[in-house]
């Protein structure tokens, strides 16, 4: 965990963890929930197979939760909801469900209610679900999973993460109600993050969305359009599978895997590699402009170089140099 994250008690940088569950391997990508770091969250959404949106059970839906919901809709990400902090005073389960249905989607369904009542509710989420329900009197896991994948069904779970209440039900739902995407045979990948390891080595985090990637493979792409978009061709030095701060080196990453690679110096968040197109321009844009004030005696060009390194990791910084005023903005 980053020192700033520990000090503030929040997530600032997206991180990943590898989890092995019965019949399922999961890569968990933890994204910032704080409004100030929304851009980091948006960059990660494009590589998700499914999202778990955490809602405060004590406060209900908040403005930033609605922003995240719009982003998930934009990137067509299937969503499960976990209503947290149910151990604290709040509106209550019934009132929260009404709020979710009214402000998010009618397909938000309480998966903690009796199965018969749940299936009756789910049958209203689509003609195919209604037909299956009328024919069989129930709904199969496959039918519900198809509704989740189509973003017509949004399973809702309630509990308290601090007290580990409700988590077993949420985790058990993943293999039952979340479909694994189908991937093509030819290589494609989505770059969602650029960072540096403790030694300063540049890391390109990407999800393989087709085929496979091998260490020492030669990749090519087009540079960041904001920086001129020059074509590049470079070799992958190492493939790393991260879980927290630790990683294992791999010779190959398959479709569906999230990994970090070294050796690439021109990649940028949102870039598509292989057959993958570049991501659309981000929906969230900075609203304020700041001037960087340096201490007396500091070299502005040296500071600019370091800030541009940060801008590789967060393109929304939009670092610029005004030659006339010799100011960094």
What do these predicted regions represent?
Residues 1-329:
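Structural and coupling elements of P-loop NTPases
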């Amino acid at each position: 965990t980053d020192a700033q994250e520990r000090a503030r008690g929040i997530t600032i940088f997206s991180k990943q963890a590898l989890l092995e569950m019965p019949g399922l391997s999961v890569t968990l990508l933890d994204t910032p929930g704080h409004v100030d770091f929304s851009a980091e969250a948006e960059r990660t959404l494009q590589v998700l197979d499914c999202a778990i949106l955490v809602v405060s059970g004590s406060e209900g839906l908040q403005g930033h939760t609605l922003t995240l919901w719009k982003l998930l809709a934009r990137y067509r990400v299937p969503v499960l909801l976990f209503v947290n902090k149910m151990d604290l005073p709040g509106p209550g389960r019934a009132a929260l469900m009404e709020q979710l249905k009214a402000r998010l989607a009618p397909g938000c369904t309480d998966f903690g209610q009796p199965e018969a009542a749940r299936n009756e509710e789910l049958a209203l989420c689509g003609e195919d679900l209604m037909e299956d329900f009328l024919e069989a009197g129930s709904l199969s896991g496959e039918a519900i999973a198809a509704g989740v994948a189509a973003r017509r069904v949004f399973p809702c779970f309630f509990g308290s993460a601090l007290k580990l209440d409700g988590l077993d039900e949420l985790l058990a739902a993943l293999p039952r109600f979340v479909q694994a995407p189908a991937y093509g045979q030819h290589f494609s990948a989505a770059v969602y993050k650029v960072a540096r390891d403790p030694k300063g080595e540049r890391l390109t985090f990407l999800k393989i969305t087709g085929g496979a990637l091998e260490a020492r493979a030669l990749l090519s792409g087009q540079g960041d359009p904001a920086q001129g978009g020059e074509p590049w061709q470079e070799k992958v030095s190492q493939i790393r599978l991260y879980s927290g701060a630790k990683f294992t080196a791999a010779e190959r990453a398959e479709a569906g895997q999230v990994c970090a690679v070294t050796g690439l110096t021109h990649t940028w968040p949102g870039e598509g590699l292989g057959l993958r197109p570049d991501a659309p321009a981000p929906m969230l844009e900075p609203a304020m402009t700041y001037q960087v004030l340096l201490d007396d005696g500091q070299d502005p060009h040296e500071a600019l170089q370091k800030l541009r390194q940060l801008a590789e990791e967060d393109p929304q910084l939009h670092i610029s140099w005004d030659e006339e005023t010799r100011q960094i903005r």
